[in-house]
Swiss-Prot record:
Forms part of the ribosomal stalk which helps the ribosome interact with GTP-bound translation factors. Is thus essential for accurate translation. InterPro entries: Ribosomal_bL12, Ribosomal_bL12_C, Ribosomal_bL12_C/ClpS-like, Ribosomal_bL12_oligo, Ribosomal_bL12_oligo_N_sf. One of its GO terms (biological process) is translation. The keyword Ribonucleoprotein applies. Keywords: Ribonucleoprotein, Ribosomal protein. Pfam families: Ribosomal_L12 (PF00542), Ribosomal_L12_N (PF16320). Belongs to the bacterial ribosomal protein bL12 family. The keyword Ribonucleoprotein applies. Homodimer. Part of the ribosomal stalk of the 50S ribosomal subunit. Forms a multimeric L10(L12)X complex, where L10 forms an elongated spine to which 2 to 4 L12 dimers bind in a sequential fashion. Binds GTP-bound translation factors. This is Large ribosomal subunit protein bL12. SUPFAM superfamilies: ClpS-like (SSF54736), Ribosomal protein L7/12, oligomerisation (N-terminal) domain (SSF48300). It comes from Polaromonas naphthalenivorans (strain CJ2).
């Protein structure tokens, strides 16, 4: 029996979410695999299926407000970005602004904590 990829995709396209869920469970049992372990490499490749939610891998650290300790926030911005004093002050004065762009989750969380410890309001996008 020849495999007809187009017919298979047509059948998948016509299935309901419940039917797709049952199919995934049957595949897991038949082949001894887990959909969770298959989802991680797919998310990294950028091609996740409709039933699999992609986890965000790049974050922007956005300075919303400097707060009362502006000098401490400027120092933190300088440490995080390597900017000069004037550039860091301009960035803080112009809030909301991106402090870091395209950072991985760990770096973004660390930057957020550092800025919040200095007294700033920060958001990850």
């Amino acid at each position: 029996m020849a495999f007809d990829k187009d017919a298979f995709l047509t059948v998948l396209d016509s299935m309901t979410v419940l039917e797709l869920n049952d199919l995934v469970k049957a595949i897991e049992e038949k082949f001894g695999v887990s959909a969770a372990s298959m989802a991680a490499p797919a998310a990294g490749g950028g091609g996740a299926g409709a039933a699999v939610a992609e986890e965000k891998t790049e974050f922007n650290v956005v300075l919303l407000e400097a707060g009362a300790q502006k000098v401490q926030v400027i120092k933190a911005v300088r440490e995080l970005t390597g900017l000069g004093l004037k550039e860091a002050k301009d960035l803080v004065d112009g809030a909301p602004k991106n402090v870091k762009e395209g950072a991985n989750k760990a770096d973004a969380e660390a930057a957020k904590k550092k800025l919040e410890d200095a007294g700033a309001k920060v958001e990850l996008k």
